[in-house]
């Protein structure tokens, strides 16, 4: 049976939850990944970590650095290196826009989510972000605590 057209068919693999706390997210975009066969099999087994990774420009190309995709357990001598550089596939226009923002305005590009889209392709949701200062992080934490307290009070009252 076919899936309805409007249903989100994303199969989430990994999420960088600390990115929204450590960075102020300004813009997001979707990028493809150049992967080997054993990397895809390892991702299908929901094994990946993008918490400490970031994206960078080198030699006119866009690369994902420090992402961890463990070796495929059933793989043999053709297995991959777990922390290798992975090329990101974005359009030329998006790449130039990101490069200008990163080089001029002191921003960074961080991955938010790694998932398979509805066609079964591995995609990475990237964010153009600016690092938060310590006082901004404290303010975010206070807001989160207050929202939890409000929810607790309303739940107990009603």
Curated annotation (Swiss-Prot):
The record's GO molecular-function terms, alphabetically, read: RNA binding
In the UniProt record, the gene name given for this protein reads smpB
Against Gene3D superfamilies, the record matches this protein to: 2.40.280.10
The protein in question is named SsrA-binding protein
Role: Required for rescue of stalled ribosomes mediated by trans-translation. Binds to transfer-messenger RNA (tmRNA), required for stable association of tmRNA with ribosomes. tmRNA and SmpB together mimic tRNA shape, replacing the anticodon stem-loop with SmpB. tmRNA is encoded by the ssrA gene; the 2 termini fold to resemble tRNA(Ala) and it encodes a 'tag peptide', a short internal open reading frame. During trans-translation Ala-aminoacylated tmRNA acts like a tRNA, entering the A-site of stalled ribosomes, displacing the stalled mRNA.
A Pfam match is: SmpB
Q: Using the chain's own numbering, where are the disulfide bonds? A: none
Taxonomic placement: Bacteria, Pseudomonadati, Pseudomonadota, Alphaproteobacteria, Hyphomicrobiales
The subcellular localization recorded is:
Cytoplasm
Per the record, what is one GO cellular component?
cytosol
């Amino acid at each position: 049976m076919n899936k309805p057209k409007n249903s989100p068919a994303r199969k989430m693999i990994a999420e960088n939850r600390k990115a929204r706390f450590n960075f102020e997210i300004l813009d997001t975009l979707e990028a493809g990944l150049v992967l080997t066969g054993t990397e895809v099999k390892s991702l299908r087994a929901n094994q990946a970590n993008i918490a400490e990774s970031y994206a960078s420009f080198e030699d006119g190309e866009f690369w994902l650095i420090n992402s961890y995709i463990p070796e495929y357990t059933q793989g043999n001598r053709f297995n991959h290196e777990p922390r290798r550089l992975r090329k990101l596939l974005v359009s030329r226009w998006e790449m130039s826009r990101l490069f200008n923002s990163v080089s001029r305005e002191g921003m960074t590009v961080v991955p938010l989510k790694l998932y398979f889209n509805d066609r079964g392709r591995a995609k990475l949701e990237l964010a153009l972000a600016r690092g938060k200062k310590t006082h901004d992080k404290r303010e975010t934490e206070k807001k989160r605590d207050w929202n939890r307290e409000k929810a607790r009070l309303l739940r107990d009252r009603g």
